[in-house]
Protein backbone atom coordinates (compact mmCIF):
# COMPACT_ATOMS: atom_id res chain seq x y z
CA UNK A 1 0.00 0.00 0.00
CA UNK A 2 2.79 2.42 0.87
CA UNK A 3 4.67 1.65 -2.35
CA UNK A 4 1.60 2.18 -4.52
CA UNK A 5 0.79 5.46 -2.77
CA UNK A 6 4.32 6.74 -3.29
CA UNK A 7 4.38 5.67 -6.94
CA UNK A 8 1.09 7.49 -7.50
CA UNK A 9 2.65 10.57 -5.89
CA UNK A 10 5.49 10.46 -8.42
CA UNK A 11 8.54 9.52 -6.35
CA UNK A 12 11.95 9.43 -8.04
CA UNK A 13 13.49 6.92 -5.63
CA UNK A 14 12.66 4.89 -2.54
CA UNK A 15 14.64 5.57 0.65
CA UNK A 16 14.11 2.73 3.11
CA UNK A 17 15.78 4.16 6.20
CA UNK A 18 16.40 3.91 9.96
CA UNK A 19 15.90 0.15 9.73
CA UNK A 20 16.70 -2.04 12.72
CA UNK A 21 15.62 -5.40 11.26
CA UNK A 22 17.24 -6.96 8.20
CA UNK A 23 14.08 -8.97 7.61
CA UNK A 24 12.05 -5.75 7.48
CA UNK A 25 14.56 -4.39 4.95
CA UNK A 26 13.97 -7.50 2.85
CA UNK A 27 10.22 -7.05 3.13
CA UNK A 28 10.42 -3.44 1.97
CA UNK A 29 12.69 -4.28 -0.97
CA UNK A 30 10.44 -7.14 -2.08
CA UNK A 31 7.35 -4.93 -1.82
CA UNK A 32 8.98 -2.30 -4.03
CA UNK A 33 10.35 -4.71 -6.62
CA UNK A 34 7.13 -6.74 -6.80
CA UNK A 35 5.20 -3.52 -7.42
CA UNK A 36 7.41 -1.63 -9.86
CA UNK A 37 10.27 -3.97 -10.77
CA UNK A 38 13.58 -2.18 -11.27
CA UNK A 39 12.09 1.05 -12.61
CA UNK A 40 12.69 3.16 -9.46
CA UNK A 41 16.01 3.15 -7.55
CA UNK A 42 16.09 1.82 -3.98
CA UNK A 43 18.33 3.12 -1.19
CA UNK A 44 18.39 1.15 2.08
CA UNK A 45 19.99 2.44 5.28
CA UNK A 46 20.07 0.77 8.67
CA UNK A 47 20.79 2.17 12.11
CA UNK A 48 23.58 0.64 14.21
CA UNK A 49 24.22 0.66 17.95
CA UNK A 50 27.53 1.17 19.79
CA UNK A 51 28.39 -2.53 19.29
CA UNK A 52 28.15 -1.99 15.51
CA UNK A 53 25.08 -4.16 15.20
CA UNK A 54 21.46 -3.29 14.57
CA UNK A 55 18.94 -3.73 17.37
CA UNK A 56 18.19 -7.18 15.89
CA UNK A 57 21.89 -8.12 15.83
CA UNK A 58 22.86 -7.66 12.16
CA UNK A 59 26.45 -6.60 11.54
CA UNK A 60 27.45 -4.10 8.80
CA UNK A 61 28.85 -6.63 6.30
CA UNK A 62 25.78 -8.87 6.51
CA UNK A 63 23.47 -5.93 5.83
CA UNK A 64 25.43 -4.97 2.72
CA UNK A 65 25.74 -8.52 1.38
CA UNK A 66 22.01 -9.23 1.71
CA UNK A 67 20.81 -5.91 0.33
CA UNK A 68 23.26 -5.91 -2.58
CA UNK A 69 22.36 -9.50 -3.46
CA UNK A 70 18.69 -8.46 -3.65
CA UNK A 71 19.50 -5.73 -6.14
CA UNK A 72 19.21 -2.46 -4.22
CA UNK A 73 20.96 0.51 -5.78
CA UNK A 74 22.69 1.87 -2.67
CA UNK A 75 23.08 0.78 0.95
CA UNK A 76 24.41 2.32 4.12
CA UNK A 77 23.54 3.73 7.52
CA UNK A 78 21.63 6.64 8.96
CA UNK A 79 20.62 8.07 12.33
CA UNK A 80 22.39 6.13 15.10
CA UNK A 81 24.96 8.78 16.08
CA UNK A 82 27.07 11.62 14.76
CA UNK A 83 29.47 11.28 11.80
CA UNK A 84 32.51 11.10 14.10
CA UNK A 85 31.27 7.76 15.49
CA UNK A 86 30.52 6.10 12.13
CA UNK A 87 34.02 5.43 10.79
CA UNK A 88 34.34 1.74 11.61
CA UNK A 89 30.85 0.80 10.37
CA UNK A 90 31.53 2.67 7.12
CA UNK A 91 34.90 0.93 6.66
CA UNK A 92 33.35 -2.48 7.26
CA UNK A 93 30.55 -1.79 4.78
CA UNK A 94 32.95 -0.52 2.14
CA UNK A 95 35.04 -3.70 2.35
CA UNK A 96 32.21 -5.79 0.90
CA UNK A 97 30.12 -3.27 -1.04
CA UNK A 98 30.13 -2.92 -4.82
CA UNK A 99 27.32 -0.34 -4.81
CA UNK A 100 27.28 3.28 -3.58
CA UNK A 101 27.41 3.73 0.19
CA UNK A 102 24.90 6.07 1.87
CA UNK A 103 25.79 7.89 5.11
CA UNK A 104 23.26 10.15 6.87
CA UNK A 105 24.32 10.80 10.48
CA UNK A 106 22.64 12.76 13.22
CA UNK A 107 23.99 16.15 14.24
CA UNK A 108 25.86 14.53 17.10
CA UNK A 109 24.11 13.28 20.23
CA UNK A 110 20.73 14.43 21.57
CA UNK A 111 20.32 16.33 24.81
CA UNK A 112 17.34 17.82 26.61
CA UNK A 113 17.33 21.58 27.14
CA UNK A 114 14.32 23.37 28.62
CA UNK A 115 12.11 20.42 27.72
CA UNK A 116 13.27 20.38 24.09
CA UNK A 117 15.56 17.88 22.35
CA UNK A 118 18.62 19.47 20.75
CA UNK A 119 21.80 18.04 19.20
CA UNK A 120 25.35 18.92 20.18
CA UNK A 121 27.01 19.23 16.75
CA UNK A 122 26.74 22.54 14.92
CA UNK A 123 26.87 22.88 11.14
CA UNK A 124 30.60 23.68 10.97
CA UNK A 125 31.62 20.65 13.02
CA UNK A 126 29.17 18.40 11.15
CA UNK A 127 30.67 19.45 7.82
CA UNK A 128 34.21 18.85 9.11
CA UNK A 129 33.34 15.36 10.41
CA UNK A 130 31.66 14.36 7.13
CA UNK A 131 34.88 14.92 5.17
CA UNK A 132 36.73 11.75 6.28
CA UNK A 133 33.64 9.64 5.54
CA UNK A 134 33.60 10.97 1.98
CA UNK A 135 37.34 10.38 1.67
CA UNK A 136 36.87 6.77 2.79
CA UNK A 137 34.51 6.20 -0.14
CA UNK A 138 30.97 7.06 0.99
CA UNK A 139 29.31 8.64 -2.04
CA UNK A 140 25.75 9.57 -1.02
CA UNK A 141 25.87 11.89 1.98
CA UNK A 142 23.19 13.67 3.98
CA UNK A 143 21.88 14.21 7.47
CA UNK A 144 19.32 12.77 9.85
CA UNK A 145 18.08 13.87 13.29
CA UNK A 146 19.13 17.36 14.34
CA UNK A 147 20.51 18.39 10.96
CA UNK A 148 19.20 21.54 9.30
CA UNK A 149 19.52 23.10 5.84
CA UNK A 150 22.59 24.89 7.20
CA UNK A 151 24.24 21.58 8.13
CA UNK A 152 23.71 20.30 4.59
CA UNK A 153 24.89 23.55 2.98
CA UNK A 154 28.10 23.58 5.02
CA UNK A 155 28.69 19.90 4.24
CA UNK A 156 28.33 20.49 0.50
CA UNK A 157 30.74 23.43 0.65
CA UNK A 158 33.29 21.38 2.58
CA UNK A 159 33.09 18.47 0.13
CA UNK A 160 33.13 20.38 -3.16
CA UNK A 161 36.69 19.24 -3.97
CA UNK A 162 36.11 15.59 -3.02
CA UNK A 163 35.52 13.39 -6.06
CA UNK A 164 32.83 10.72 -5.70
CA UNK A 165 34.32 7.43 -6.85
CA UNK A 166 32.29 4.60 -8.36
CA UNK A 167 32.78 1.62 -6.02
CA UNK A 168 35.02 -1.10 -7.42
CA UNK A 169 33.49 -4.52 -7.98
CA UNK A 170 34.25 -6.73 -5.00
CA UNK A 171 34.77 -10.46 -5.45
CA UNK A 172 32.90 -11.41 -2.28
CA UNK A 173 31.22 -14.81 -2.16
CA UNK A 174 29.23 -15.02 1.03
CA UNK A 175 26.20 -16.57 2.66
CA UNK A 176 24.50 -15.05 5.69
CA UNK A 177 21.91 -15.55 8.34
CA UNK A 178 20.21 -12.52 9.86
CA UNK A 179 23.18 -11.62 12.05
CA UNK A 180 26.48 -12.76 10.52
CA UNK A 181 28.07 -13.73 7.23
CA UNK A 182 30.19 -16.62 6.01
CA UNK A 183 32.70 -15.69 3.33
CA UNK A 184 33.48 -18.53 0.93
CA UNK A 185 37.03 -18.20 -0.33
CA UNK A 186 37.89 -20.44 -3.27
CA UNK A 187 41.50 -20.54 -2.10
CA UNK A 188 40.64 -20.96 1.57
CA UNK A 189 39.45 -23.73 3.84
CA UNK A 190 36.45 -25.90 3.02
CA UNK A 191 33.12 -24.79 4.48
CA UNK A 192 31.50 -27.89 5.92
CA UNK A 193 27.80 -28.36 5.11
CA UNK A 194 25.91 -30.36 7.74
CA UNK A 195 23.35 -32.60 6.00
CA UNK A 196 21.77 -34.55 8.86
CA UNK A 197 18.50 -32.58 8.82
CA UNK A 198 16.93 -34.93 6.30
CA UNK A 199 14.23 -37.46 7.25
CA UNK A 200 15.37 -40.08 4.71
CA UNK A 201 16.23 -43.21 6.68
CA UNK A 202 15.56 -41.51 10.04
CA UNK A 203 12.34 -42.93 11.53
CA UNK A 204 12.53 -40.82 14.69
CA UNK A 205 12.76 -37.62 12.66
CA UNK A 206 9.97 -38.72 10.32
CA UNK A 207 7.67 -39.32 13.29
CA UNK A 208 8.50 -35.95 14.86
CA UNK A 209 7.77 -34.15 11.60
CA UNK A 210 4.41 -35.91 11.31
CA UNK A 211 3.64 -34.52 14.77
CA UNK A 212 4.86 -31.07 13.63
CA UNK A 213 7.64 -31.05 16.20
CA UNK A 214 11.06 -29.44 15.75
CA UNK A 215 12.93 -30.73 18.81
CA UNK A 216 15.04 -33.27 16.93
CA UNK A 217 15.69 -30.83 14.08
CA UNK A 218 17.06 -28.30 16.57
CA UNK A 219 19.15 -30.96 18.33
CA UNK A 220 20.64 -32.08 15.00
CA UNK A 221 21.39 -28.48 14.05
CA UNK A 222 23.13 -27.64 17.32
CA UNK A 223 25.14 -30.88 17.26
CA UNK A 224 26.37 -30.29 13.71
CA UNK A 225 27.36 -26.69 14.44
CA UNK A 226 29.20 -27.83 17.58
CA UNK A 227 31.17 -30.29 15.43
CA UNK A 228 32.22 -27.65 12.91
CA UNK A 229 29.43 -27.30 10.33
CA UNK A 230 29.45 -23.80 8.82
CA UNK A 231 26.25 -24.27 6.76
CA UNK A 232 23.19 -26.41 7.53
CA UNK A 233 21.28 -28.22 4.79
CA UNK A 234 17.53 -28.43 5.48
CA UNK A 235 15.44 -31.14 3.79
CA UNK A 236 11.91 -32.00 4.89
CA UNK A 237 11.06 -34.54 2.18
CA UNK A 238 9.12 -37.50 3.57
CA UNK A 239 5.69 -39.12 3.24
CA UNK A 240 2.78 -38.19 5.48
CA UNK A 241 3.60 -34.52 6.03
CA UNK A 242 3.01 -31.17 4.37
CA UNK A 243 6.59 -30.64 3.19
CA UNK A 244 6.15 -26.93 2.53
CA UNK A 245 4.65 -26.28 5.96
CA UNK A 246 7.44 -28.17 7.71
CA UNK A 247 10.17 -26.52 5.62
CA UNK A 248 8.90 -23.06 6.58
CA UNK A 249 8.63 -24.09 10.21
CA UNK A 250 12.17 -25.48 10.15
CA UNK A 251 13.60 -22.34 8.54
CA UNK A 252 11.95 -20.13 11.16
CA UNK A 253 13.07 -22.29 14.09
CA UNK A 254 16.63 -22.80 12.85
CA UNK A 255 17.09 -19.11 12.18
CA UNK A 256 16.55 -18.51 15.89
CA UNK A 257 18.42 -21.57 17.16
CA UNK A 258 21.77 -21.49 15.34
CA UNK A 259 24.10 -18.82 14.01
CA UNK A 260 25.02 -20.30 10.62
CA UNK A 261 23.53 -19.87 7.11
CA UNK A 262 20.97 -22.36 5.82
CA UNK A 263 20.96 -24.41 2.62
CA UNK A 264 17.44 -24.99 1.26
CA UNK A 265 17.07 -28.53 -0.09
CA UNK A 266 13.88 -29.66 -1.83
CA UNK A 267 12.87 -31.30 -5.10
CA UNK A 268 9.91 -28.90 -5.37
CA UNK A 269 10.45 -25.46 -6.86
CA UNK A 270 7.59 -23.84 -4.92
CA UNK A 271 8.97 -25.05 -1.58
CA UNK A 272 12.41 -23.63 -2.36
CA UNK A 273 10.86 -20.30 -3.36
CA UNK A 274 8.71 -20.05 -0.22
CA UNK A 275 11.67 -20.90 2.01
CA UNK A 276 13.85 -18.27 0.31
CA UNK A 277 11.11 -15.70 0.77
CA UNK A 278 11.01 -16.02 4.56
CA UNK A 279 14.72 -16.65 5.18
CA UNK A 280 16.18 -13.47 6.76
CA UNK A 281 19.54 -13.58 5.01
CA UNK A 282 21.34 -14.91 1.94
CA UNK A 283 20.67 -18.64 1.66
CA UNK A 284 22.17 -21.42 -0.44
CA UNK A 285 19.97 -23.51 -2.78
CA UNK A 286 20.71 -27.24 -2.99
CA UNK A 287 20.51 -27.45 -5.92
CA UNK A 288 19.73 -26.27 -9.48
CA UNK A 289 20.15 -28.75 -12.32
CA UNK A 290 20.20 -27.83 -16.00
CA UNK A 291 16.74 -29.27 -16.60
CA UNK A 292 14.60 -26.57 -18.30
CA UNK A 293 11.92 -26.52 -15.57
CA UNK A 294 14.50 -25.96 -12.81
CA UNK A 295 16.39 -23.32 -14.78
CA UNK A 296 13.16 -21.53 -15.70
CA UNK A 297 11.98 -21.09 -12.11
CA UNK A 298 14.92 -21.38 -9.73
CA UNK A 299 17.40 -19.04 -11.43
CA UNK A 300 14.89 -16.12 -11.26
CA UNK A 301 14.08 -17.07 -7.64
CA UNK A 302 17.77 -17.04 -6.73
CA UNK A 303 18.12 -13.60 -8.30
CA UNK A 304 14.99 -12.22 -6.64
CA UNK A 305 15.91 -13.36 -3.14
CA UNK A 306 19.66 -12.93 -3.54
CA UNK A 307 20.47 -16.60 -2.97
CA UNK A 308 23.57 -18.52 -4.00
CA UNK A 309 23.10 -21.98 -5.50
CA UNK A 310 24.81 -25.26 -6.19
CA UNK A 311 24.70 -25.94 -9.94
CA UNK A 312 24.48 -29.57 -10.99
CA UNK A 313 25.81 -30.45 -14.48
CA UNK A 314 22.73 -32.59 -15.04
CA UNK A 315 20.32 -31.99 -17.92
CA UNK A 316 17.59 -33.81 -19.85
CA UNK A 317 20.43 -35.60 -21.65
CA UNK A 318 21.29 -37.44 -18.45
CA UNK A 319 24.44 -37.73 -16.37
CA UNK A 320 27.67 -36.48 -17.95
CA UNK A 321 30.32 -39.18 -18.12
CA UNK A 322 33.47 -37.07 -17.73
CA UNK A 323 34.79 -33.62 -16.91
CA UNK A 324 34.58 -32.38 -20.48
CA UNK A 325 30.89 -33.29 -20.72
CA UNK A 326 30.25 -31.54 -17.40
CA UNK A 327 31.93 -28.37 -18.67
CA UNK A 328 29.98 -28.54 -21.91
CA UNK A 329 26.64 -28.80 -20.10
CA UNK A 330 27.40 -26.00 -17.65
CA UNK A 331 28.77 -23.59 -20.26
Residue ranges and their predicted role:
Residues 1-331:
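Domain-level signal for soluble alpha/beta catalytic cores
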Amino acid sequence: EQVNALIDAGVDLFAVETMMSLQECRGAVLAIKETCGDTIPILVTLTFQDDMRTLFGTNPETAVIVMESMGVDAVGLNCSTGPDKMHEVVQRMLRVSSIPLVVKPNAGLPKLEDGKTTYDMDAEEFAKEMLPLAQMGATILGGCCGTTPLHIRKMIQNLENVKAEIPEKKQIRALTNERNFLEIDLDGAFSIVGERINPTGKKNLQEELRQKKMDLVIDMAEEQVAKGAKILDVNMGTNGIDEKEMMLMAVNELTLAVDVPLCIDSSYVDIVEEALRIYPGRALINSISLEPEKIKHLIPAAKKYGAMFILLPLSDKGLPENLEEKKEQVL
